[in-house]
């Protein structure tokens, strides 16, 4: 009764403002408070005499879907996303011109959700449905809908990139860039940030494709824009700039340009540490990612003290984050444990290495029970790492167990997406062959590796097998 009265009192200022307030809280990464406001608003909308328009109800369900996704509560997020779609589809039947934009937004949000949940079939379905609507809307009013079409193209590019479908990924990334460059010519202030994001994504894509010249160009284009934007509004754009610096650090690290790599890693750390002082909840996850990258960098430079410092700093933060929200941050803690395991293994500290390897596996096994599609690839990698560890330390029974666990997962994953997982399966087969000397696995290795000469791991395996 008290809540109902409160909302009746606020009706004079408009419930749309409460929706805007919840959206504002989402932008501030204050998801708990945003959910509280949005759920109260949902309760108000359910009151029989609220007379709320279906359109606003659909908007609210979309927002709740995004909020619960951010809190890593996929069941609730999916429920709200699908309800929003159902409402918007119903509205489109009444008035397509008025409500197709809202339906496209709902489809796009569902695509993002299912991509993150590892449900690629559903993700693709919704991404393409959103694009189909947006392309139709652009023909009617390019100025109004090209920005949204570019966003949908960008999301589709990210989806196909993750699926290992490089031709489609490139097509959509470049389509997004083409639109956004045109938009920047009309209104740089409004669209340069979006163009920088597309440049950054293209850099990541071309790095993965081994096209280093293109990757570097796009990374530096993104940095150039973001540094300019930071001069105008540091609070708004420093987080994006830090992300670009981190990506450039990874790129130059992988290409052996160590001074540049260190420069960009440390620049990213400097920004994120400053941002964490202002808003720890929002930026500590990003800081831990760069700490891990810096740890790997210094490990490669044979500076174990610095490497250990950054690895442990990442773990310390992530353990604290897990205490606040295990669902959201346990995957990242598991990644840090895995990295620490590799570090201590190579430092000749097997007890610490084993501790971190097994801690990573424990988390991933728990995560897989909640969401197989999202976490099985990481679990397979952890099993493989443990197999290699026990093999190197003469514990062949444990090594065999973990290698077979990894192989079992990779064989399942290959059935779903051969392009993405065949190289990892071939590598696992090879390590198992070295352990057991079972020629059946050597034949399997060679069959995959010979066919997958597009992947450097497979090219290396072919050289090894043919040399043998």
List where the protein language model places each region:
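Leucine-rich, hydrophobic repeat-scaffold detector
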Residues: 1-92, 97-98, 103-109, 115-118, ...
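Flexible helix-coil transition and linker loops at the boundaries of alpha-helical arrays
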Residues: 2-13, 43-56, 89-100, 135-146, ...
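Conserved alpha-helical positions within TPR/SEL1-like repeat arrays
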Residues: 16-27, 55-70, 85, 101-115, ...
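Periodic short-repeat tracts
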Residues: 106, 112, 120, 124, ...
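Terminal, low-structured helical/coil segments at or just beyond the last alpha-helical repeat
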Residues: 444-468
């Amino acid at each position: 009764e008290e809540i109902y009265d409160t909302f009746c009192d606020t009706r004079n200022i408009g419930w749309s403002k409460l929706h805007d307030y919840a959206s504002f809280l989402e932008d501030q990464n204050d998801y708990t408070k945003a959910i509280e406001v949005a759920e109260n608003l949902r309760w108000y909308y359910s009151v029989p005499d609220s007379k709320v328009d279906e359109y606003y109800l659909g908007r609210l369900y979309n927002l709740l879907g995004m909020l619960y996704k951010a809190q890593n509560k996929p069941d609730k997020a999916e429920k709200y996303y699908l309800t929003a779609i159902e409402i918007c589809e119903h509205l489109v039947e009444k008035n397509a011109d008025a409500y197709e934009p809202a339906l496209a937004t709902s489809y796009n949000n569902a695509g993002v959700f299912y991509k993150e949940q590892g449900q690629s079939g559903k993700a693709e379905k919704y991404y393409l449905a959103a694009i189909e609507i947006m392309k139709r809307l652009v023909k009617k009013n390019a100025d109004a809908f090209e920005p949204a079409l570019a966003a949908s193209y960008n999301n589709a590019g990210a989806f196909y990139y993750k699926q290992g479908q490089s031709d489609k990924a490139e097509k959509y990334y470049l389509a997004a860039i083409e639109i956004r460059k045109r938009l920047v010519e009309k209104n740089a202030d409004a669209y340069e940030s979006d163009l920088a994001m597309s440049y950054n994504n293209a850099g990541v894509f071309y790095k993965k494709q081994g096209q280093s010249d293109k990757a570097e160009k796009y990374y530096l284009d993104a940095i150039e824009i973001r540094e300019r934007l930071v001069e105008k509004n540091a609070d708004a754009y420093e987080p994006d700039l830090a992300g670009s610096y981190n990506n450039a650090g990874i790129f130059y690290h992988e290409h052996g340009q160590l001074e540049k790599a260190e420069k960009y890693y440390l620049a990213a750390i400097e920004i994120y540490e400053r941002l964490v002082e202002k808003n720890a909840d929002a930026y500590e996850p990003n800081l831990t990612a760069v700490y891990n990258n810096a740890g790997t960098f210094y490990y490669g430079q044979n500076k174990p003290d610095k490497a250990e410092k950054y690895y442990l700093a990442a773990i310390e933060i992530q353990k604290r984050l897990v205490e606040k929200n295990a669902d959201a941050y346990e995957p990242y803690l598991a990644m840090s444990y895995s990295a620490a395991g590799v570090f201590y293994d190579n430092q000749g500290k097997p007890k610490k290495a084993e501790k971190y390897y097994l801690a990573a596996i424990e988390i991933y096994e728990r995560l897989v029970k909640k969401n197989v599609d999202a976490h099985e690839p990481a679990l397979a990698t952890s099993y493989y790492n443990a197999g290699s560890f026990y093999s190197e330390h003469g514990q062949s029974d444990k090594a065999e167990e973990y290698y077979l666990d990894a192989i079992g997962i990779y064989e399942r994953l290959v059935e779903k997406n051969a392009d993405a997982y065949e190289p990892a399966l071939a590598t696992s087969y090879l390590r198992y062959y070295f352990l057991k000397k079972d020629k059946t696995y050597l034949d399997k290795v060679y069959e995959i590796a010979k066919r997958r000469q597009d992947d450097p791991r497979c090219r290396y395996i072919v050289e090894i097998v043919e040399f043998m």
